[in-house]
Amino acid sequence: MASYAVLGATGNCGSALIQLLLQRPDASIHAFCRNKPKLIGLLPEIEKSERVTIYQGSIKDTDLLTACLRGRRAVFMVLSSNINEPGFRVGRDANKAVIEVLRTLHREDSGSTGPPPKIILLSSATLDDTLSRKTPYLLRQILHMSASHIYNDLAETEKLLRAEQEWLTTVFVKPGALSVDEQRGHALSFVESDNPVSYLDLAAAMIEAADDTTDKYDMKNIGVVNTNGAARFPTGTPLCIATGLLRHFVPSLHPYLP
């Protein structure tokens, strides 16, 4: 049975991943979250599913995280935010915890159960010159500033994971804008990312990268493109950009912004 862990299960990407994995009868899913009732509210079918185990708690709970990651083939790291919170470091903290747990498990197993699980990290095309080359320069700068604290966390997270590449494999999935919309069809790309892409298409792309056995995506930056039309424009984007810019230029306003 194909075994996966989803960290950040209650987010748009995490819930989309679980939704698609549930369609596969061979998938075993460990869902890590801080709020189990919220996750069940999003995906009621998982409450009685024998193929889904929910781990509720803090990413700093080493025993809980170890139980979640043990025996997994791939780990989807989809912990992020749409709020440009000053000092944001969820990605760094979570990935440090995951690296330490996987290192311990790797030493305990001594390779007897195969390589460590592959990390599939949700990042952003805005951080990659090639994948975002179709985005006008000025717009890209605005987007970067509007999520500067989040992107700084992502950049540092990527450094952490690349420093472990001798024993731990990561695929860096970098979509453009994301939208809550239906699944239309996707393709993985080394040279571009479309705007916008639905979370379901992003999730399908991440699963494809996790299941690849050729290693062609390992340690690479991967974009996601639409194959059957673009997703709907996310209507909350203008407000998200505006409040993100305020948090970038005047961080002290953060507690007072939506």
UniProtKB/Swiss-Prot annotation:
Organism the protein comes from? Claviceps purpurea (strain 20.1)
Q: Function, please?
A: Oxidoreductase; part of the ergochrome gene cluster responsible for the typical purple-black color of the ergot sclerotia. The ergochrome gene cluster produces several ergot pigments including the yellow ergochrome secalonic acid and its derivatives, as well as the red anthraquinones endocrocin and clavorubin. The pathway begins with the synthesis of atrochrysone thioester by the polyketide synthase (PKS) CPUR_05437. The atrochrysone carboxyl ACP thioesterase CPUR_05436 then breaks the thioester bond and releases the atrochrysone carboxylic acid from CPUR_05437.
Query: What InterPro entries does the annotation carry?
Result: NAD(P)-bd_dom (IPR016040), NAD(P)-bd_dom_sf (IPR036291)
- Under Enzyme Commission nomenclature, its number is 1.1.1.-
Q: Does the keyword Oxidoreductase apply?
A: yes
**Gene3D superfamilies in the record:** NAD(P)-binding Rossmann-like Domain
Family affiliation: Belongs to the avfA family.
Under what conditions is it induced? Expression correlates with the formation of the sclerotia and thus the pigment production.
Keyword tags: Monooxygenase, Oxidoreductase
Looking up Pfam families in the UniProt record yields:
NAD_binding_10 (PF13460)
Q: Name one GO molecular function term.
A: monooxygenase activity
Q: What is this protein called?
A: Oxidoreductase CPUR_05430
